[in-house]
Amino acid sequence: TLLEGPGSFGKEVRAVVQSWSVLLLSQGHAVHWIDGGHRFDPSKFFPAMRSLNCSIEESLRRLYIGRGFTLHQLHALIVRVRHELALTKASIIVIDGMLAMFLDEQIKRFESRSILRHCLASLEDLAKFCPVIILDGRTTSPLHQQLKHTMRPYLSQHFTGQWENQKQRR
């Protein structure tokens, strides 16, 4: 499932998925969060956890975070999460800022699209066992548009979030 929203690669719509994740964590479920955008901050979960009166420490033990600092690291994390899912029995897998990695100009376009297709096939396979949410934002370039086009056959659903008072959210 692609969840697209305002902000750089869906930065603002991430709050929605964080809320879903906190709810699952507070109920004793595990969550995998793969960060491809170098922006994951677990402290953003704390206010919602406190409001649900759940133990932050206990909840964070069930939050499995993977950070890919390069495209190849992100690819390895996505491939590996299938094996981890068998152990953790996670209720959701979040891939945050994935397409940002594929826009790196140092990666050849053919290689980039090939890795993207492999990642998407792996995630599509994972989605048979557990919901997979890919976060992204509005298209930023022609290459970004091409990458989204490559994603379409692999997506079961595509949701777009939009804030009513966009100017006030800045």
Place the predicted regions along the sequence by residue.
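Glycine-rich P-loop/Walker A and Walker A-like loops and their local beta1-loop-alpha1 context
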Residues: 1-35
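Structural motif
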Residues: 2, 92-96, 133
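Short, basic, glycine/proline-bearing loop/turn elements
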Residues: 2-6, 64-67, 108-109
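Catalytic-core regions built around general acid/base machinery
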Residues: 20-23, 115-129
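Conserved inter-motif catalytic segment of the P-loop NTP-binding fold
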Residues: 34-105
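Alpha-helix N-cap and loop-to-helix initiation/capping positions
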Residues: 107-115
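Phosphate-binding/switch region of NTP-binding enzymes
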Residues: 124-170
